[in-house]
Design a protein with these regions (language model features):
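Transmembrane helix-loop-helix hairpins at lipid-water interfaces of multipass membrane proteins
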Residues: 10, 14-74, 78, 151-156, ...
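ABC-type nucleotide-binding domain
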Residues: 333-589
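Juxtamembrane helix-loop junctions of ABC transporter transmembrane domains
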Residues: 21-22, 29-42, 64-111, 115, ...
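An intracellular "coupling" helix at the cytosolic face of ABC transporter transmembrane type-1 domains
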Residues: 10-13, 100-104, 120-129, 133, ...
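Transmembrane helices of ABC transporter permease
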Residues: 11, 15-28, 32, 130-186, ...
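Helix-loop-helix
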Residues: 50, 149-166, 233-312, 316-317
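Conserved catalytic Walker-motif region of ABC-type ATPase nucleotide-binding domains
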Residues: 98, 220, 313, 342-344
C-alpha cells in the first residue's frame, strides 16, 4: 500500500486532508451531544424545572446533530471523489504499463490475470478508499476522543471499557491472521476461473463440435467450487465479527449499568442525580468507543483482500518492459530505405531455455522479398517478430537501413514496418478506424488513400458492397467478416501506412488460391520499393521470392531461390512435393 500511496496526486491529498478535517469536526459535534443529554437529565430530575428550560439544550442538541449529519455527508462526498479520481489514473497507469510490456512480460502474467488486476483488483482499492477515508479516520478519532472524555469519570467504568477494547482488538487480530493467507489464494483462483471462462467462450465452437460441454463444465465447476469454498471460509470468519462486536457492546452496556447501580446505591441522596447523569454521559461515550472499533472492524473485513490486490497491482507497476528505448536513439541515413540484415541472430525466451532460432544470417536489399518456410514450430514467426522488437535478440544483431534495431527509437522503428500477424486482428469501431489505426508518417489517412490500400489488398469489392462503405461497423474481433476478409483488411491496414518493410506472418493462410495469387501479383507490381518478409506454409505463396530461408528446429537448413532449393535442399523438396506437382513447381503455376 505504501507504493500505491506514492501515486496519490497533490489534489487528492488536499481532498484527503479536507476529509480528515470534516471527520474531526463531525466527531467533535457528536461527542458534544451527550453533554446536553446530561444537562437535560439533570433538569428533568430537578424538582420545579420549567418546561421552557429544556428547550435551550434540546435545540442545541438537535442543531449539533444536523451539523454532524451535514459534515458526514461532506466526508462521504470527498471520499467518493478521491476514490474515483485515484483509481481512474491508477487504472490508466496499469493499462499503459501493460501496453508497454513485451510478449515476455505478458506471458509471465497471462491475459486473464492482467484483466483481473485491471478490473477486480482496482475495484478492491476503490472500496478501501471509499470506506477507509470514512472509517479509518473516523474510527480511531472517535475512539480516542471518546476515551479522553471518559478519563477521570470512574476507574470502574473505565476498566470495563478497557477490557471491551482489548477483547475487540484480540478478536480482530485472530480473524485477520486466519483470513489474510486465504485472500491471496482466492485471487489466484479467480485468475484461474477467468482463464477457464475465457478459454471456453473463445473456443465455444470447438467445445460444441466435440461435445465437450460436460468436460468444460467440470473444469469450471472444480475451479468455482474451490473459490466458493475459500470465500465461504473467509466470509464465515468475517460474519462472526459483527455478532461478537454486538455482544461486546451489549456486555459493556450491562457492565456500565451494573457498576453504576452499585455506585449510585452507595451514594448519598444528593449525589445520586449527578451520578446518574454521569452514567448516562459515560454510557454515550463508551458506545462511541465501541462504535469506533466497530467501524475499524468493518474495514478489516475488506482489508485482507485489498492488501492482496495492492500487491498484485504493484507486481504489474513494478515490472518494466524488457524492450526499452535507447537513451540516445540513432537515425538511419535517408539514402538507405528498406534494407534488412540479420547477423548471426540467436533468440531464447529466457537465459536458461533452449534457443528458438539459432545463428540466422541473411540480407535483404530495398524492394526484395525474403520468405521463410519450415515445419510448425521451426521458429519462422519468432524470427520476424524480432525485427519490430516484439522480442530482443539473445545474440547477434538485426540492422534496418544499416542501424541496429535496438538503437532506434521504438516509434521510429515501427513506423518503418507494416506488420500483418498470423491471426488478423480487427478492432471494434468501423472500417475507416481500422485502416487509419495508430501513428505513422501517413496519418491521418485520406479516404482516397484508404480505398487505394483496400484495392491493393483485394478488399475494395466487399467494402463497396456494404451500404456504409468505410463507415461500416466492425464489432470486436471483426466477427462480421470472414477469415479471408479479415486477413485482407489487416493487409490493407499495413499497406495504408506505406512502410519501408512489410512483414507477412503467415498472412495469406485464410485466402483461397486465386485471391492469394492475384494479391501476390498486385503486391509485386505496386510495392516494388517495399521490402517484404513473408512467413508462409504454402510453397505457391513464396515461389517468386528473391530469397527463401528453410528453417528446421530453429536453424537455417537451406537458403536460396525456389529453383535452387528445389534442386538441392531435401527439406524444401519434401514440403514442395507434398503440396504441388512436379510440373507446377518447375513452371511456377
Amino acid at each position: 500500500m505504501k507504493k500505491l500511496a506514492k501515486r496519490i496526486t497533490g489534489k487528492e491529498w488536499g481532498m484527503i486532508l479536507l476529509t480528515v478535517l470534516f471527520t474531526c469536526f463531525s466527531v467533535y459535534l457528536e461527542l458534544e451531544v451527550p453533554t446536553y443529554i446530561s444537562e437535560i437529565t439533570e433538569l428533568i430530575g430537578t424538582p420545579g424545572t420549567d418546561m421552557g428550560a429544556l428547550w435551550s439544550p434540546a435545540i442545541k442538541m438537535i442543531g449539533l446533530s444536523l451539523l454532524a449529519f451535514l459534515s458526514s455527508v461532506t466526508v462521504g462526498f470527498f471520499a467518493a471523489r478521491v476514490a474515483a479520481s485515484y483509481t481512474t489514473h491508477l487504472r490508466s497507469d496499469i493499462f499503459h504499463r501493460v501496453l508497454d510490456f513485451s510478449q515476455t512480460e505478458i506471458k509471465r502474467f497471462s491475459i486473464p490475470s492482467l484483466l483481473t488486476r485491471t478490473t477486480n483488483d482496482i475495484t478492491q482499492i476503490q472500496m478501501l478508499f471509499t470506506m477507509g477515508l470514512q472509517v479509518v479516520t473516523r474510527g480511531p478519532i472517535m475512539a480516542i476522543w471518546a476515551i479522553g472524555k471518559i478519563l477521570g469519570k470512574s476507574e470502574y467504568w473505565l476498566w470495563a471499557v478497557v477490557i471491551a477494547v482489548i477483547v475487540n482488538v484480540l478478536m480482530t487480530t485472530v480473524l485477520m491472521t486466519l483470513a489474510f493467507p486465504k485472500q491471496s489464494v482466492i485471487q489466484k483462483l479467480t485468475d484461474k476461473l477467468n482463464s477457464i471462462t475465457r478459454e471456453s467462450l473463445t473456443g465455444i465452437r470447438v467445445v460444441r463440435a466435440y461435445n465437450a460441454e460436460d468436460y468444460q463444465d467440470q473444469k469450471f465447476e472444480e475451479a468455482n467450487a474451490e473459490v466458493t469454498r475459500l470465500n465461504l471460509f473467509v466470509n464465515r470468519l468475517m460474519a462472526i465479527m459483527n455478532p461478537i462486536m454486538m455482544a461486546i457492546s451489549s456486555g459493556l452496556s450491562l457492565a456500565i449499568y451494573w457498576i453504576g447501580a452499585y455506585i449510585i446505591n452507595d451514594a448519598s441522596l444528593t449525589d445520586r442525580l449527578p451520578l446518574f447523569s454521569d452514567m448516562v454521559v459515560f454510557m454515550s461515550y463508551a458506545m462511541q468507543v465501541v462504535i469506533g472499533f466497530l467501524l475499524m472492524g468493518a474495514l478489516f473485513i475488506v482489508l485482507p483482500r485489498t492488501l492482496v490486490s495492492a500487491g498484485r497491482i504493484n507486481q504489474v507497476l513494478d515490472l518494466h518492459s524488457s524492450i526499452e528505448n535507447p537513451s540516445q536513439p540513432q537515425t538511419a541515413d535517408s539514402s538507405i530505405q528498406g534494407q534488412v540484415e540479420f547477423r548471426d541472430v540467436t533468440f531464447r525466451y529466457s537465459k536458461n531455455s533452449e534457443a528458438v532460432v539459432e545463428h540466422v544470417s541473411f540480407k535483404a536489399e530495398a524492394g526484395q522479398t525474403v520468405a521463410f518456410i519450415g515445419s510448425t514450430g521451426s521458429g519462422k514467426s519468432t524470427l520476424v517478430n524480432l525485427l519490430p522488437r516484439f522480442y530482443d535478440v539473445s545474440d547477434g544483431e538485426i540492422l534496418v537501413d544499416g542501424v541496429n534495431v535496438q538503437d532506434y527509437d521504438l516509434e521510429d522503428l515501427r513506423n518503418k514496418v507494416g506488420y500483418i500477424p498470423q491471426k488478423a486482428v480487427l478492432f471494434s469501431g468501423d472500417v475507416k478506424g481500422n485502416l487509419d489505426f495508430g501513428k505513422s508518417p501517413e496519418t491521418p489517412l485520406s479516404e482516397t488513400a484508404m480505398w487505394q490500400a483496400l484495392e491493393l489488398a483485394q478488399s475494395k469489392s466487399f467494402i463497396e458492397d456494404k451500404e456504409a462503405g468505410l463507415n461500416s461497423e466492425v464489432p470486436q474481433g471483426g466477427t462480421n467478416f470472414s477469415g479471408g476478409q479479415r486477413q485482407r483488411l489487416a493487409i490493407a491496414r499495413a499497406l495504408a501506412r506505406k512502410p519501408e518493410i512489410l512483414i507477412f506472418d503467415d498472412s495469406f493462410s485464410a485466402l483461397d488460391y486465386k485471391t492469394d495469387r492475384i494479391l501476390r501479383q498486385v503486391l509485386a507490381e505496386k510495392t516494388q520499393s517495399m521490402t517484404k518478409l513473408i512467413v508462409a506454409q504454402r510453397i505457391s505463396t513464396i515461389m517468386d521470392a528473391d530469397l527463401i530461408l528453410v528453417l528446421d528446429q530453429g536453424k537455417v537448413v537451406g537458403q536460396g531461390t525456389h529453383k535452387e532449393l528445389l534442386a538441392t535442399n531435401e527439406v524444401y523438396q519434401e514440403i514442395a512435393y507434398s503440396q504441388l506437382s512436379k510440373e507446377e513447381l518447375e513452371h511456377g503455376k
